[in-house]
Regions:
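Asp-box/BNR beta-propeller blade signature and adjacent active/binding-site loops
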Residues: 37, 42-392
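Low-complexity, intrinsically disordered flanking regions
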Residues: 1-55
Length: 392
């Protein structure tokens, strides 16, 4: 469904449905608006804190004018993500909406992300399946994690983070496990996976604890996704903030390996982007700090992060800060900020650079090599362009 058609069918209904809710409400609808709706009525005003244009970086980033599609023509779909395999293949993943259903699809690139061809379907359902994320856990063995919610006439009736597995490089998929599941009304969303130092699979997801509290959770698998530990809340279980949509990249702090997690949150009412650091491979997190706050009354969310060979980082996100009319997630553009390695837990982020104009949605990012990353987003279909890091 096109963005314009989706807006016409759903925006009016959304405004009525959420008018009596608190400032943040989760919805599970198809298309570009199937993540979160933010109501900004009655919020306190906060001063806008500009990211410093004087941040000194150990290199010069360049956004390249080389946009390409992430699937076969006509290249439709949303929520694009990328996964590099050990044989050099790159898989893209995205959600399509055939015949009133949802289809989680995979496309394949064998030329380092220059071109992609449709490759496989992980699952298809009439329920709310979306937010797919791929991770290779052994050569040729790939996990696909995604939200998989049963829907009734009044909303979700069961929440799941489902995991499927492929052992042939992503061509054929089979059910592996439920990494997490729960009953309504409080939901779970937005899985992210990485492989830890000991070869274990770490799966992070967002879980609601109250209407004004959502946290990042972690489950771990040591059998390539067949079974998972009980969920652990990593931070903020008592905070009146809605942290979500996390992404993680590896970096260094004075030679010590570190992980940096970015996520959207609601510290100022509308969404902004913050981060946490871990020095024990994701077991514990701290050193919380701001990555990007848009101008007053506007939003920045859905972040993802990748790092370069020298430990410098690029965080991509969507924001409506350039729009005069705030109706999140409409009117969003895609931007990126950069930072050098942390220094004793401190990170300084640059001012933002535009990647894709409005209306663009649900960005992702993946390292291509030591000095290039591939940034993804949905602007009428899953697209990508490269960002090059020129070390000083």
């Amino acid at each position: 469904m096109s963005l314009r058609a989706f807006e016409q069918q759903n925006v009016a209904a959304l405004q009525v449905k959420f008018l009596s809710h608190s400032q943040i409400s989760n919805i599970t609808m198809p298309g570009h608006f199937g993540q979160k709706v933010l109501k900004t009525l009655g919020l306190n005003d906060h001063a806008h804190q500009q990211n410093s244009s004087a941040v000194r970086l150990p290199g010069r980033p360049a956004v390249n004018n080389d946009e390409r599609g992430l699937s076969s023509p006509p290249n439709n779909g949303t929520y694009p993500r990328l996964c590099r395999l050990s044989d050099g293949t790159i898989l893209s993943s995205f959600t399509r909406f055939p015949d009133g259903q949802r289809s989680l699809r995979v496309a394949k690139s064998t030329d380092n992300g220059l071109t992609f061809e449709d490759f496989s379907e992980v699952t298809r359902a009439a329920g709310d399946v979306d937010n797919m994320f791929l991770c290779e856990v052994a050569p040729g063995t790939i996990l696909a994690a995604f939200r998989n919610h049963d829907m009734g006439p009044n909303g979700p009736t069961h929440f799941r983070i489902t995991v499927c597995r492929s052992t042939d490089g992503g061509r054929v998929w089979q059910f592996a496990s439920q990494a997490a599941e729960k009953r309504p009304p409080l939901g779970i969303w937005e899985p992210f996976m990485r492989v830890g130092r000991q070869g274990e699979v770490q799966l992070y997801f967002s879980q609601e604890f109250a209407h004004n509290n959502q946290c990042t959770m972690l489950v771990v698998s040591r059998d390539q996704g067949s079974t998972w530990t009980q969920p652990t809340c990593l931070h903020g279980d008592q905070d009146p903030l809605r942290d979500g949509m996390c992404g993680i990249a590896r970096t260094f702090d004075n030679g010590r390996e570190a992980l940096l997690m970015v996520f959207e949150t609601t510290r100022y009412g509308p969404f902004s982007v913050e981060a946490l650091l871990s020095y024990d491979d994701g077991a514990t997190w701290g050193w919380r700090h701001e990555v990007f706050r848009p101008r007053q009354g506007h939003n920045a969310g859905s972040p993802q992060i990748a790092s370069f060979a020298d430990g410098s980082m690029a965080t991509i996100f969507m924001t409506d800060e350039d729009s005069n009319h705030v109706e999140w997630v409409k009117n969003a553009s895609i931007k990126v900020v950069f930072a050098s390695q942390p220094v004793e837990g401190r990170v300084q982020w640059s001012s933002p650079t535009l990647i894709s104009p409005a209306s663009s949605f649900w960005p992702g990012i993946m390292a291509l090599d030591h000095h290039n990353v591939l940034a993804t987003y949905d602007r009428g279909g899953p697209l990508a362009k490269t960002i090059t890091w020129h070390p000083a």
